[in-house]
Amino acid sequence: MPATDDATLAVSVVVPACGRMDLLDRNLDALMRQQFDPQRFEIVVVDDEPNHNTLHLVAGWRTRTLERGPRLSYVANSGPSGPASARNRGWRAARAPIVAFTSDDAVPEPTWLSEGLAAFQDGLDVVCGRIRTPVPARPTEQQRSARVLEEADFTSANCFLRKPVLERLEGFDERFNVPRGSDADLHFRLLEHGIAIGRAPRALVVHPVRPAPWGASLLQIRHAVFDALLYKKHPALYRQKIEPRPRWDHYLIVATLLLGLASLLMGLTIFATLAFAAWLLLTIRLCAHRLRGVAHTPAHVADLVLTSALLPPLAVFWRLTGALRYRVRFA
C-alpha cells in the first residue's frame, strides 16, 4: 500500500459493515476500481458487528492492494450498534477534509469519487450523488419500496460532506439505531442550518435490492417507532417531506376491528357483523393498493394478502409506542 500523507488525502470513504461478507467484498472491489488517485483517498470500514470475519476480509484486501490501492483501515464499533453509530465512528476516524459515505451493500461506479468531488464548487459543503436500484418491470413490494432511494433528496448510501460540517452538526443521531430515520434527520438538520446541498448526478452508486424473506414487512414495521422521534425533532419538515398526514386508514382499520371485537363480547351481533364487514372491506382496499403494479406470483400475492391484515395493528402499535417513548403527540 503506498504511503499516504494526510496532506495529500482529498476524501475518506466510510463504509459501515454488519457481517455481510459477500456484500462488503463486492463493495470493496468497486472502491478499489475507482478511477481516482489511490494516494488521494482512504477507505474506513466500520464493523458494526465486530467479528474476525470482517477483520480478515479487510486484512485480505489490504494485503492484495498493498502496492497499488488506497489506504484501507478497519474500525470496530465498540459503542452502541446501528448504522448511525457506525458512520459516526467512521467519519471521526477519517483523515481527509471530505467524508464520502456509502453502504456495504452498495456498488459505487468507477467514477463515483471523481464525479462527487468535482461537484464541490461555489463554497458547497455537502454533495449528494445518484442512486440506481435495478428492479424488474413487475417488482416485489420490497423492490418497489427500495426504488424511493432513486428520488431521495439525501441518502447516506451516496453523499459527501466536509468534515467541519459533520463536526458542527455532531454527525448522525445515534438514537436512530436502525436503518430508518438517521438519514432524514441529518438532511433536515442541514436544511435547518441553511447548509446548501449540491447535486452530482454522475456520481452514481448502484444499490441492488436483496431478496426479502416472506413477511418482511411485518418485521420492518417495528422501525416505525422512530418516526415519532423524527417528527418530534422536525415536525414541519416531517409533514412536508415524509408524511403530509397520519395514516388514518390504518387507524380506521384498527378501530373497526376493535369495535367488532367489543360488540361481539357484548353480544351485539348486528354491530359486530357490520364492524367486521367494514374491517374486511378496508383491509381488501389496503391489499389492493399494495398489489397495484407489483409482481403477482402466488407466493408474493399470499404474502401481501396475509400481511395486509396484520400490518395496520402493528403499525398503529409501533407509532403509538414511539409517541409514548419520545413524549410527542404523534399519530
Give a label for each model feature:
Residues 1-33:
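N-proximal low-complexity "stem/linker" segments adjacent to membrane-targeting elements
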Residues 9-12, 42, 185:
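Cell-envelope/extracellular polymer assembly enzymes that use nucleotide-activated donors
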Residues 29-76:
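Acidic donor-binding segment of Leloir-type glycosyltransferases
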Residues 74-94, 153, 157:
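Glycine-rich, basic loop-to-helix element that forms the pyrophosphate-binding segment
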Residues 99:
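Short aromatic/hydrophobic "clamp" motif used to bind/position activated sugar donors
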Residues 107-139, 208:
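Conserved donor NDP-sugar-binding/catalytic core segment of glycosyltransferases
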Residues 144-161, 168, 177-179, 185, ...:
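A recurrent flexible, glycine/aromatic-enriched loop bordering the glycosyltransferase active site
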Residues 178, 184-240:
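Catalytic donor/gating beta->alpha subdomain of glycosyltransferases that bind UDP-sugars
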